[in-house]
Amino acid sequence: KLDSAMTSWVEDSLELARRSNGAFDPTIGRLTRLWNIEGDNPKVPSKQEIKNTLKDTGYTKIHLEKVETQNTDTTKKNVDKDRKDNTDKNGDAAKDTDNNTINSTAQNTADNMVNNEADNTPDNTALNEERLETTDKKINTDESVSSIYIEDQCTLDLGAVGKGIACDVAQNYLKQQKEVSGAVIAVGGSILLYGSKADGTNWNVAVQNPRGKDGEAMGVVSLSGTTNVSTSGDYEKYFMQNGKRYHHILDPSTGYPAESSLISVTVVSDNGLLSDGLSTACFVLGKEKGQKLLETYGAEGIFID
């Protein structure tokens, strides 16, 4: 059973994947681990390794179904029908696999992810350590529930928006603290600006120079009210091989680090998850397509090439 928070995170992630045409994809966790860019001895995987791993990715292999109270057989039939319709729509015949339902481990994983998000190393991210487990047990409860069905060997990994989710969770908490009128919370490359400053002036967020030294800023963004700012770039997590930079932002369509001519994207949005995910998607898409994507969400961005 997935509660409303976890369901919302999955829904928003899949919607972003659809709108970006897969430039953001929450199923490439295995590909990220294959590259192991933050490991001790990263190296470029072989073409065959990347090809084999890509076969197990693809956001269209994730099916989220909200299920009202009904008997198990009816629930299974409805979800199977939804899977078939979705597969036909995308023109990609799904392989014959068991209809696995994510059990309550998914919710525990989500909670752990938020609690441990300060450690943003892929191998230490809770959602990477404790993979979403599946079981043949079907959920039958008196409450409305959500079930996830994952095809083949695909895995769902919300680590790519984990920092943004942490900001959203923090914002919800701050809303309940009447004595807090303003706060700044930074989680890796994502920042929550909450409320207002005590002196009434705007929040000022520095935009780092991707090729500068010691966190040198190349500009400042002035913002008011509650908002989220997330940055994705090629300059903090990367390795060099044969004179070429291999960064951690992978293009789900190729399996290799994205090559869009951009070196940094900063996104401003009222939603933490979206600011985090959009910065990644825009980096992969490039400036022109990235700007169009931001417009569909009413978000703003800074593109550096």
Please place each PLM-identified region on the residue numbering:
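Mature catalytic core of soluble alpha/beta enzymes
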Residues: K1-D305
